[in-house]
């Protein structure tokens, strides 16, 4: 889910930076800097900051409760929403940068040719822009999905999740560090790695970009 959300958010952003903002190099550079800026802050610090911002007694939560968006006994931290939000935010640069690289290389004359042939914007996007940006989509999806599948920080009860939002990474971490059940943890790790490899192989072959492997 976080990977899909990241793609839906990153594609328009990367398209604007890589295609529309070409005429304004300063704006293009500024937006790229903003995309890269989170890398200069620790992953743990970023996640912990979101936990503090959406804590049970935070201004955001109390305001949403007063507006009736949240029930008086309803909170955000420890929910699936916050886990997905954290994953999407933390890994969205890994989706945006490959997309930007593909779209920045896009020849604008191809888009203009499509318009000259009376294709509407939707057809130009579906038949020109989307196919040419497919390598960026594949690369961004893989760079996002693989770390998300094994992530155990965002869903941890110490950060944005709870015991009810545990991901497989949290189960592996608990078996290794708390229960000391090393055989089960090792087996789960191997199963996770095999599942990711199988899904990635299937995804790349179905998309017709085997040369990326």
Task: Give the positions of each predicted feature.
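Membrane-embedded alpha-helical segments of multi-pass transporters/permeases
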Residues: 7, 11, 15, 44-47, ...
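Hydrophobic alpha-helical transmembrane segments of multipass integral membrane proteins
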Residues: 1-9, 13, 126, 130, ...
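Membrane-helix interface segments
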Residues: 20-30, 60, 79, 121, ...
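Transmembrane alpha-helices
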Residues: 4, 89-109, 119-151
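Membrane-interfacial helix termini and adjacent extracytoplasmic/periplasmic loops
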Residues: 27, 47-88, 122, 158-164
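Interhelical loop and adjacent transmembrane-helix boundary motif
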Residues: 148, 152-205, 209
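Transmembrane-helix boundary motif in ABC transporter permease subunits
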Residues: 2-35, 201-205
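Short hydrophobic faces within alpha-helices
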Residues: 17, 37, 109-117, 185
């Amino acid at each position: 889910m976080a990977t899909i959300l990241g793609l839906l958010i990153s594609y328009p952003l990367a398209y604007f930076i890589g295609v529309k903002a070409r005429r304004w190099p300063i704006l293009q550079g500024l937006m790229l800097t903003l995309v890269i800026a989170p890398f200069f802050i620790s992953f743990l610090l970023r996640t912990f900051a979101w936990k503090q911002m959406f804590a049970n007694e935070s201004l955001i939560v109390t305001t949403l409760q007063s507006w009736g968006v949240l029930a008086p006994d309803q909170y955000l931290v420890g929910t699936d929403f916050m886990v997905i939000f954290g994953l999407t935010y933390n890994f969205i640069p890994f989706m945006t940068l490959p997309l930007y690289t593909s779209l920045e290389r896009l020849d604008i004359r191809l888009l203009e040719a499509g318009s000259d042939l009376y294709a509407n914007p939707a057809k130009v996007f579906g038949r020109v822009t989307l196919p040419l940006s497919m390598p960026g989509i594949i690369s961004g999806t893989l760079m996002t999905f693989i770390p998300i599948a094994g992530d155990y920080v965002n869903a941890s009860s110490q950060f944005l999740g709870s015991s009810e939002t545990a991901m497989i990474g949290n189960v592996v971490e608990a078996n290794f560090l708390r229960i000391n059940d090393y055989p089960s943890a090792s087996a789960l790790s191997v199963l996770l790695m095999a599942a990711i490899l199988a899904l990635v192989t299937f995804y790349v072959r179905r998309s017709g970009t085997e040369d990326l492997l």
